[in-house]
Amino acid sequence: MVSLPMLARPVCLPVAARLVRKDTVSASRLWLARQMVLMLAEALPGRRIHVVADAAYAGKELRGLPEQVSWTTRLRKDAALYDPAPPRTGRPGRPRQKGRRLPSLAQLARTAAFTPTVVVRYGQKSTVYTATVCCLWYGVFGPQHVTVVLLREAAAGAGYDLALVTTDLQATPARVVERYAARWSVEVSIEDAKQLVGVGEARNRVAAAVERTVPFGLVCQTLAVCWYATAGHDPADVAEHRARAPWYRTKTHPSVADMLGKLRRVLVAARFRCARPEQPTPAELHAIRLAWQDPAA
């Protein structure tokens, strides 16, 4: 997920994919996610990588991640949290790996001190109330310290509305909440890949084609967005779109469909540009007309 200057929301750029075979004995999704994160960390040494996932991506596979990788996910209601391990006593025997067990999340929320926090989620600025607890989620991350962020939408009331956990101990509560909210761009990217790029429409039978077609389509989507961000963007793009559709008055930022449409027009124009002026053929005129009439194609 990256932030682009011409967009008010983060955008997801797929760079890796793995095949999951349903109803078969295969590697778990979490293990595959870990392998992709390790591959990305190896390709980007020295870069900080923040991974955000839903509650399904939490397990013992997350132990031993590189220091440059942080993991943020939703905390389960029945998660067993512990105090950090006490200092060594110097006595013989194995040192303790964890402290006393903490109360449940509901009990922690009753006694926690919630403070107002300004966050930007889904393109809007709002005020929520957060409380943090530094502890261990030993069943998942082992002895690694984590920060639990309890979120409450309203000032009044008891309990909490959302519980997040992160291994990024330097992140503020607002940053953790915003980071988790930005995960929604993954769902938007998958929808764009299916509806605009055509990922998943191929009818493949060969094993290699099944493994490569969808990742190739996702990479093409990423390359198209990168091209638009570096070379294709023009401030007049949105104004041009609103001129074509004057009833669409709320549009203020280009969409992925706009990016793909402009890339298509540029490719068509480059394809039919001649070295010397010549009369275009009816087929060429028809292709250009279709490209301009259907910018989302």
Where are these regions (language model features)?
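Short conserved beta-strand segments at catalytic cores or DNA/RNA-binding microdomains
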Residues: 1-9
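Single, function-defining residue in the core of a domain
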Residues: 10-297
